[in-house]
Curated annotation (Swiss-Prot):
GO cellular component, as recorded: cytoplasm; DASH complex; microtubule; mitotic spindle
Entry protein name: DASH complex subunit DAD4
InterPro entries per UniProt: DASH_Dad4 (IPR013959)
Keyword Lipid biosynthesis recorded: no
Disulfide bond keyword on record: no
Alphabetized UniProt keyword annotations: Cell cycle, Cell division, Centromere, Chromosome, Chromosome partition, Coiled coil, Cytoplasm, Cytoskeleton, Kinetochore, Microtubule, Mitosis, Nucleus
Subunit relationships: Component of the DASH complex consisting of ASK1, DAD1, DAD2, DAD3, DAD4, DAM1, DUO1, HSK3, SPC19 and SPC34, with a stoichiometry of one copy of each subunit per complex. Multiple DASH complexes oligomerize to form a ring that encircles spindle microtubules and organizes the rod-like NDC80 complexes of the outer kinetochore. DASH complex oligomerization strengthens microtubule attachments. On cytoplasmic microtubules, DASH complexes appear to form patches instead of rings.
Entry's family note: Belongs to the DASH complex DAD4 family.
Primary location group: nucleus
Function noted in UniProt: Component of the DASH complex that connects microtubules with kinetochores and couples microtubule depolymerisation to chromosome movement; it is involved in retrieving kinetochores to the spindle poles before their re-orientation on the spindle in early mitosis and allows microtubule depolymerization to pull chromosomes apart and resist detachment during anaphase.
Residues forming coiled coils: 13-50
UniProt subcellular location: Nucleus; Cytoplasm, Cytoskeleton, Spindle; Chromosome, Centromere, Kinetochore
Amino acid sequence: MENPHEKVQVGILARIVGNVERLNQSVATLNQELERINTRNRNLELMGQMCEHYGRATAFNLKTTGNRQGPV
């Protein structure tokens, strides 16, 4: 005996599989973009740390040598 709902179920399953494949592709693309953003953020964080350390070293050297002046 043939299931009368089989064709409908097969169609629904095919749509689900197609949607899941598209979703997986979208998630993979999102992950790639997030990785690029994270790389850029790491680079910006490193630059910020370098600037902060440079500022501290400059302030220390100016204070140590006695060449530090007040703000203009």
